[in-house]
Every structure is written in C-alpha cells, then in structure tokens.
Amino acid sequence: MAPKKDVKKPAAAAAPAPAPAPAPAPAPAPPKEEKIDLSAIKIEFSKQQQDEFKEAFLLFDRTGECKITLSQVGDVLRALGTNPTNAEVKKVLGNPSNEEMNAKKIEFEQFLPMLQAISNNKDQGTYEDFVEGLRVFDKEGNGTVMGAELRHVLATLGEKMKEEEVEALMAGQEDSNGCINYEAFVKHIMSN
C-alpha cells in the first residue's frame, strides 16, 4: 500500500454576500377617525322638541352656567331616548382626551347638533336583534338565561357596564331560580 498523500482540499468558495434586506414596509397609517362636521348638520327637531331637550339638558348642569361637561353628553343623549355607544359619543365629540372629557364644557346650542347626529344614526338595535343576541345564552331553549351569566356578560363583554349599572338594569328581573325571561327583559330595557 502506498503511503497516503496529503491531499489539499480546495479552498471553499467564498460564501456569497447575503442579499440586502428589503426595505421595511412603511408602517400602516393609523386609521383616520371620521370626524363629524356638526356645523353641517341640519336640525330637524321642532321648536317644542328643542325646548324639551333644553330642559333635560339643563337638569345636568351642575354649575348654573347652562353648560355640561363632555363626560355628561352621553348621559344626556341617553336621557333623551337615544342609545349611542360610548364610541359613538366620543366620535360626535371629536374624540377628546380623558382630561378634556372632564374639563371641557358645552352649551345647549353646541349639544343640539350632536343629538341630531346621533338621532339620525339608523344603526340602532331592534327588539329582534337583542332577543337573538340573548338567545345564544339560552342553554335550555326555554326563553330564559341565567341571571348570573347575564350579569357577567354585561360587565365583561363589549361596552362593559359598571356593577351598579348592571344591578340597576336587572333589578326585579330574576325569577325564584335566578333566571331571566330575556324577551320580557328586552321589552323592559327598550321601554326605558
């Protein structure tokens, strides 16, 4: 056997330089908040309605200035029979900061176009919508939901309600088994 020769291995070819990384995609622009132009809203309420609305508005005036804070606008809107979400209220207010919600005040003349904008919104839930939503929780298929489960849902999902609000809403609605007839419950809510 012949002695092994020291065979030189060919030098490894230089690794190709990695391709330059593509430029990062531009960050998506934050979604533009739709702003409602309150000056363009035509007031369609009668003089009598406006007088009634002003009377209710002034019930929320805590300082005697004929003004309310932005944080009270949702309460006044709801007291006048509309049912806007908190997001809709903030949108009609121009998406103010939390500090502005408690510090800024508006007069009735500024409030009226907001009420009209919310009143014009036809995207309000109907009786059937609410019943259908609660039917999901009707495990027995007997037209009732557990009061404890409904309390949990109202306090933790969607536009979360405070415990006191849930209790006020559900007062007198449960039967002796802790169940709530959800069709009667929806009628109760919609009549208020």
Swiss-Prot record:
Phosphoserine modifications at: 71, 97
GO BP: muscle contraction
Region annotation (Disordered) ranges: 1-34
Residues annotated with Phosphothreonine modification: 69, 85
Keywords annotated in UniProt: Methylation, Motor protein, Muscle protein, Myosin, Phosphoprotein, Repeat
Coiled-coil parts of chain: none
Pro residues bias (residue ranges): 17-30
Keyword Methyltransferase: no
Cellular component, GO annotation: contractile muscle fiber; myofibril; myosin II complex
Domain of life of the organism encoding this protein: Eukaryota
SUPFAM superfamilies, per the entry: EF-hand
Entries under InterPro entries matching the protein: CALM/Myosin/TropC-like, EF-hand-dom_pair, EF_hand_dom
GO molecular function (one): calcium ion binding
Protein's UniProt keywords contain Repeat: yes
Modification type N,N,N-trimethylalanine: residues: 2
Domain EF-hand: 48-83, 125-160, 160-192
Main function: Non-regulatory myosin light chain required for proper formation and/or maintenance of myofibers, and thus appropriate muscle function.
Subunit note: Myosin is a hexamer of 2 heavy chains and 4 light chains. Does not bind calcium.
Name of protein: Myosin light chain 1/3, skeletal muscle isoform
Species per Swiss-Prot/TrEMBL record: Bos taurus (Bovine)
Gene: MYL1
